[in-house]
UniProtKB/Swiss-Prot annotation:
The keyword Zinc-finger applies. This is Formamidopyrimidine-DNA glycosylase. One of its GO terms (molecular function) is damaged DNA binding. It comes from Streptomyces coelicolor (strain ATCC BAA-471 / A3(2) / M145). One of its GO terms (biological process) is base-excision repair. The active site is at P2, E3, K61, R270.
Length: 286
């Protein structure tokens, strides 16, 4: 599933190619793609028609397109395989094309939502005074947000009584961090994924947040992480941060710091990758 860097890459592409364009018509080709829009496909298409798309926004992994002169926005949920592509009109339809948005201008391109597994979708929602769709009001700010409160995050960690990787994936504490970037940041910080959050000092939390931001910015610089053709930017291009990963997916390969073979352990229906020497597991108290 795309994490913050991948979603931000898409947001930037939409800002360049779709923002400030007026919707001429919308074609919903698969009803599941708008299942979160409870009024149905026809209502979704009708409500977008003739509206101008504002500057795309993002919080964590959530991306939305505000409709100018309204208090509503189109929320994009990419799921496991969703893609927002800006394509020339004449480009043949993708096999898993679900929604097509045509614009009332002569630029010759349209916005397409393509989703192989149909776990994602688009939906229209009311927004708050600060432009946030109401359905994601509970989502915390992400670490690249200038208003993210490092001090409040540290205190929340200390109160949470959980482990550090669980906390990094808790969208009510910090958004945008998924399995890949959690493993990468923890490796950089030399923290084991099962380290209790109550044991983190303020300097350790500061260091960890610095690594989270560094790894995300590094991924952003190269278009995000693509392990297959399902994650692409709006022009259909893959990112290549997977070439720079230090932890994720490197089971059995030498740690880039100490050369100890990296390990993988099952974790919450996922996997955690770590160095057994650099990232010592917490001591178990009898």
């Amino acid at each position: 599933m795309p994490e913050l860097p991948e979603v931000e890459v898409v947001r930037r592409g939409l800002e360049r190619w779709a923002a400030h364009r007026t919707v001429a018509d919308v074609e919903v080709l698969h009803p599941r793609a708008v299942r979160r829009h409870v009024a149905g496909p026809d209502d979704f298409a009708h409500r977008l028609k003739d509206h101008r798309i504002g500057t795309p926004s993002r919080r964590g992994k959530y991306l939305w397109l505000p409709l100018e002169d309204t208090d509503q926005a189109v929320l994009a949920h990419l799921g496991m395989s969703g893609q927002l592509l800006v394509q020339p009109h004449e480009t043949p339809a993708e096999k898993h094309l679900r929604i097509r948005v045509r614009f009332a201008d002569a630029l010759g391109t349209e916005l397409r939502f393509v989703d192989q597994r149909t776990f994602g979708g688009l939906s229209l929602h009311d927004t708050s005074a600060d432009g946030l769709p109401d359905v994601i009001a509970h989502i915390a700010r992400d670490p690249l947000d200038p208003l993210f409160d490092d001090e409040a995050f540290h205190h929340a960690l200390r109160r949470k009584r959980t482990t550090i990787k669980r906390a990094l994936l808790d969208q009510s504490l910090i958004s945008g961090v998924g399995n890949i970037y959690a493993d990468e940041a923890l490796w950089r910080a030399r923290l084991h994924y099962e380290r209790p959050t109550a044991t983190l000092t303020r300097p350790r939390t500061t260091e960890l947040l610095g690594h989270v931001r560094d790894v995300m910015n590094a991924a952003l610089a190269v278009g995000g992480t693509s392990f297959d053709s399902l994650y692409v930017n709006v022009n259909g291009e893959s990112g290549y941060f997977d070439r720079s990963l230090d932890a994720y997916g490197r089971e059995g390969m030498p740690c880039r710091r100490c050369a100890t073979p990296m390990r993988r352990r099952p974790w919450m229906n996922r996997s955690s990758y770590f160095c057994p020497k650099c990232q010592r597991p917490p001591r178990v108290t009898p």
